[in-house]
């Protein structure tokens, strides 16, 4: 193991362990993080983080935040996080379909923005499940 990953939400420490590799969804695309990565502070988009430990991948849906990478320490502050293996597939699929419909029916700018955010969150939860299946 080469990286120390710590993921924190407002109400709890979500993850705190050594990892081999991390793949993050940033506002400018996905980035991979390995040992001795260049120091970086980046905004995280709503999406999935992939974490490799002992050659096995774990996924988690992250609902936006920030990541700081420095000296093999990765600290992630998120609004909310959910491990892929803890998400109910049926619930996630239903929520995804509902948010798709809401997005299509949105009329005002505010409704469109709110519907897009809800859709991105639902999509991230569904992707976190499908990546581990």
From Swiss-Prot:
Domain of life of the native organism: Eukaryota
Write down what this protein is called: ATP synthase epsilon chain, chloroplastic
> Which GO molecular function terms does the record list?
ATP binding; proton-transporting ATP synthase activity, rotational mechanism
User: Which keywords appear in this protein's UniProt record, sorted alphabetically?
Assistant: ATP synthesis, CF(1), Chloroplast, Hydrogen ion transport, Ion transport, Membrane, Plastid, Thylakoid, Transport
Function, as annotated? Produces ATP from ADP in the presence of a proton gradient across the membrane.
Q: What's the protein's topology in the membrane? A: Peripheral membrane protein
Its localization reads:
Plastid, Chloroplast thylakoid membrane
**CDD domains named in the record:** F1-ATPase_delta
Source species, please?
Chara vulgaris (Common stonewort)
Q: Is Transcription given among the entry's keywords?
A: no
User: Chloroplast as a keyword?
Assistant: yes
Pfam family membership, one: ATP-synt_DE
Q: What does the record note on quaternary structure?
A: F-type ATPases have 2 components, CF(1) - the catalytic core - and CF(0) - the membrane proton channel. CF(1) has five subunits: alpha(3), beta(3), gamma(1), delta(1), epsilon(1). CF(0) has three main subunits: a, b and c.
The principal localisation class reads: plastid
Gene Ontology CC terms, in alphabetical order: chloroplast thylakoid membrane; proton-transporting ATP synthase complex
Q: Which family does it belong to?
A: Belongs to the ATPase epsilon chain family.
Concerning InterPro entries, the annotation shows: ATP_synth_F1_dsu/esu (IPR001469), ATP_synth_F1_dsu/esu_N (IPR020546), ATP_synth_F1_esu_C (IPR020547), ATPsynth_dsu/esu_N (IPR036771)
């Amino acid at each position: 193991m080469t990286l120390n990953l710590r993921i924190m939400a407002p109400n709890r420490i979500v993850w705190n362990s050594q990892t081999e590799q991390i793949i993050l969804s940033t506002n400018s695309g996905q980035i991979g993080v390995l040992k001795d990565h260049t120091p970086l502070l980046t905004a995280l988009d709503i999406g999935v983080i992939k974490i490799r430990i002992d050659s096995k991948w774990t996924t988690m849906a992250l609902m936006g935040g920030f990541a700081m990478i420095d000296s093999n320490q990765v600290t992630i502050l998120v609004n909310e996080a959910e491990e892929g293996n803890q998400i109910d597939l049926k619930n996630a699929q239903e929520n995804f379909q509902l948010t798709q419909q809401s997005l299509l029916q949105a009329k005002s700018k505010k409704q469109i923005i709110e519907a897009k955010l809800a859709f991105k969150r639902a999509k991230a939860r569904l992707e976190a499940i499908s990546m581990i299946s």
